[in-house]
Amino acid sequence: MFSLPLHQSKLIFLLSFLLIKTLNAQPTYLLSYCYTSGNYTPNSSYKSNLDTLISVLDSQSSNKGFYSYASGSSPTTTVYGSYLCRGDISSSTCETCISRASKNVFIWCPVQKEAIIWYEECFLRYSSRKIFSILDQGPFVTWTSYDTTLYQFYFINTVEYRMDRLIQEAYSSSSYFAEETYHVSYLGEVYDLNGLVQCTPDLNQYDCYRCLKSAYNETKDCCYGKRFALVYSSNCMLTYKATFLAPPPPPPPPPPPPPPPQRLYGENDTPSSDESFSFKLGKVFRRIIAPVIAAVVIILVISVCSLCCCCIKKKKKANQREASIEIPTLNTGENLTVDHQ
C-alpha cells in the first residue's frame, strides 16, 4: 500500500486546512445595482478619478469599518464613494470583503457613473453626486429563508419587539451599531434569535432611525414569519436569524373524532327528548302494562276453562235425560222402564 512520508502528510494537511479556511472566509455576494444616471468613457477623467477612489477605499479597509472619500477637483468629474463593513466581523474579513467588492463592482457595472455592490459582510458604493451625510431612499437588497418557525404568531411578535429595541439602541449610540442574541423557548420550540442593525456613521440620528425602520418594513413584504431575513440599503443594514437549539416539536395531532351516540344511560345521564320518551315508555311497559296484560290473559284462560267445564256438564246431563224414556204397553197396566246403563 502506497503511503506518504510523515512530513509530506503534514504539509498536505496544513494546505488543506488553509484552503478550507480561505474558502470559508470568502465574502457572500448578494447583489449589485447599477444606477441609470449616466455613463463614463474608458479614458475619461471620471474613470481616472474612479480608479483612484476605489484604490483609496481598498487601502483603508484593513483598519476601518467605514470610510468615505471624494476623488477629483472638478464638479463634473469628481467621484464620491464609501464602504461599510458589518460591526460583528474582524478587520481581516472586512479587508477581504472590500477588496473583493472593489474588483467585482466593475464586472457588474462596467461603465455606470453610479453603482453599489452588496455582500453579506460589507457594501461599497460610488456616485457622481454628493452622497455623504445624505439618506438615500434608493434600492434595498433582501434575502430570506424558505423555512418558518412552528408558532409563527409568537415568532413574529418576538421579532418585532426585539428588532425595535435594537433599532432604538443603534441610533442612540455613537457607533450606530447594535446586536443581540435573544434566547426563546416556547411550547417546546427552542432557538436563539440573533439580530443586528447598523447605519453608516455619516448619518444623523433621525436619518439612521428612518433607514432602519424602512429596512424593517421591507421584511414584512419579503420575509414575514421566516426564520432568516436580511435587508441592506446604501446607508444601513438589518438582519435577524433564528437558530434552533433543538429539533422543533412535531405539530400536535388532530383531535380524535367524536364518540358515537350512546344508547345506555346511567342514573345522572340526560338523554335527548325523543330517546327520553322511548326510555320512559319502556319503563312504564315493564312496570305497569306488562303485569296488567298478564293478569288479563290469566283471567281469560280461567274464564275459558270454566266455560268449557260448564258446557261439558250441561251436555252430559242432557244426554242422561234423553236416555231415560217411558215406553207404554198395549195390553197390560204395567209400565216398562228400559235402563241403558
UniProtKB/Swiss-Prot annotation:
Gene3D superfamilies named in the record: Gnk2 domain, C-X8-C-X2-C motif
Signal peptide limits: 1-25
Pfam family for this entry, one: CR_prot_dom_plant
Disulfide bonds: C85-C94, C97-C122, C199-C208, C211-C236
Source domain of life: Eukaryota
Compartment(s): Secreted
InterPro entries per the UniProt record, alphabetical: CR_prot_dom_plant (IPR054603), GNK2 (IPR002902), GNK2_sf (IPR038408)
Compositional bias annotation for Pro residues: 247-262
Keywords: Disulfide bond, Repeat, Secreted, Signal
PROSITE patterns per record: GNK2
Domain Gnk2-homologous: 28-131, 136-245
Region annotation (Disordered) ranges: 247-274
A GO cellular component entry from the record: extracellular region
Family: Belongs to the cysteine-rich repeat secretory protein family.
Protein name in UniProt: Cysteine-rich repeat secretory protein 1
Species name: Arabidopsis thaliana (Mouse-ear cress)
Name of encoding gene: CRRSP1
